[in-house]
Amino acid sequence: MRRFLTGFLCVILALGMAFSAAAEPVRGAVRFSEDGQEQLGQPLAGLKIGIDPGHQTHANTEREAIAPDSSETKAKVASGTAGVNTRTPEYVVDLQVSLILRDILTAMGAEVKMTREENDVDISNIERAVMMNEWGADMVLRIHCNGSIDRSVKGAGMYVRKTGAMAEESAQLARCLLAAVGEYAGAQTQSVYKRDTYTGLNWSEVPCVLVELGYLSNAEEDALLNDAAYQEKLALALVWGMIDYVNTP
């Protein structure tokens, strides 16, 4: 956290520069003081944004329904992956990025709720979704890292529901997030994938995206995802994507 705090002002300044460089500045993002100095506004003021850092220290192999109307079940919380070289568990990286994201969103004026702020918890995927539904979130990001037996595979990807009331809104949010991660974090990107197999997405009653930040099974992305500066870039890019989403007609 100390490393993040030392770089936080730089992140905010970078966001301000990104806004000022845009051909059409995002509504409410930049304002000017009386002496003409550029200042950062709060473009996400009034929004309630949920963050669900994926996984937890210990998996929960008990079963729960993957959707409200389904008899199919999955483990309440899977174990997640780990860095191929760093051996850092996914749940650690998920939380690190989520905490940075929380702080930037708060600075942007959003009200933020996290499903967890520590790793040693036991919160099922249904419980995480219901928590956000009951809180009245305007949108939810589920922060994860990917893994593959093919260590050459890399790239950030977004997962949303294929069907359901929030499917298209979630897909629109996902497209904005994916574009921003590629442009502002410099990440290699994959695509927006539509699935009805993710419990946390199926139980969500608001626009919800499962964000796969990259592949911990890939040596290059393992190193990046464990780098504090890159984590800040990813978090900042996700914020930019959310701002783009809320300003899209």
What is each model feature region?
Residues 1-249:
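Catalytic-site microenvironment of enzymes
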